[in-house]
Amino acid sequence: MTTAEPRLALATRGLTKTYGDGESLVRAVDAVDLEVARGETVAVMGPSGCGKSTLLHLVGGLDRPSSGEIDLAGRRIDRLGERALARLRRTDVGFVFQAFHLMDELTVVENVELPALLAGHSPRRARARAMALLDRVGVEHKAGSLPTALSGGQRQRVAVARALSNEPVLVLADEPTGNLDSAATLDVLRLFEELHESGQTLVIVTHDERIAATADRLITMRDGAFVDETRLTGGTSGRLGALAGFES
Amino acid sequence: MQQEVVLALLAKEPSHGYQLRARLRQALGPVGEAMNAGQVYVVLTRLEKAGLVTTERPERPNPAKTAKDPADRKTYVLTPQGQQRVAEWLTEVSWPKPDLAEFHLKLVAAAAAGLADPLGIVDTQRRELLRRLREAQRAAMAEPDGSDAALLLEGIVLRLQADLRWLEACERSWTTRRSTS
């Protein structure tokens, strides 16, 4: 019997990423302390260049910090070697990007099963898992299509399915609705809500107030640091009528 | 509720009050939840007094079939003046007015008198708008595709987003002013 699962999916302490030196030193991420509980959805907002994407890359092992610590599910990852870090990116973290980053020459199901194949699962098992995930995100009928034949919203659903391929501890999303119209955004928000309800931990960096408003917690970032934190949970106020100008 | 709204709903066919209420509920979804059940009747009574609507009663009321509320036994019908008012209303250009000036002046006055930090006021407002956005967004997510109410909720969401963007502009501007003063 192993020890109990750690409460936190992610924790950083003094996480810092700098570029350049001397006069031209830029603190892209400046001593960030972040704790994300298992099952929590956290949105990070801030203007372009505030460091939110860099933060996401650091905690997902796509980039290395200049200093500070990162714990992913209780395991230090800031000092991992290149190979261990590559394995971590494949198995413990799922990424969703603004531009989807699907491989256009592979079919939808091939895109989704790729992470499982890279992690060493059998083709049969990888395919079965991919089909189950496509079913879960509602695009199983497009399994044999090329990504270019799909709408933006459908492509992002496929990207989410791919991110879930290896049952990651953490799903990281970078402007996931940046390329989507209003209806497709709603669609992706519903999908995130379903993931949230199933207990998936999500960290989303975004400009989109709609995502921010549906997260459990909203962190505002400026110049590489957290400047505000808001917990948005709570019941309804019944004021929708007033919001619509429909006075009751 | 605007009288014209009820008038226009009645343009489809002569209806009972509860039928109008059902049409409103259908179109508004969660937005209409706070609507008082008696409101439609209050408006209908006003419309009747104004000569825009008349009522018809069934000739021989069947107690088994009629609704409990006596007002529900009446069928409301548009008068020619009512028809005309609906036609006019449909061509009128009106749009809800946002009241940005008051908030803007609050920031200006707070900063000038040194009473409060404009950025603090912006923050408080932003949280409130985010809460409202959360509520509208959640309601929108719960609506089935293509529902009338979903379209209305999208409108609420887009307006709140626009307000939040303006608050960002306020924040940028007041941050710059503070650091240069």
Residue ranges and their predicted role:
Chain A
Residues 7-215, 221-226:
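ABC family nucleotide-binding domain
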Residues 1-18, 231-248:
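ABC-family P-loop ATPase nucleotide-binding domain
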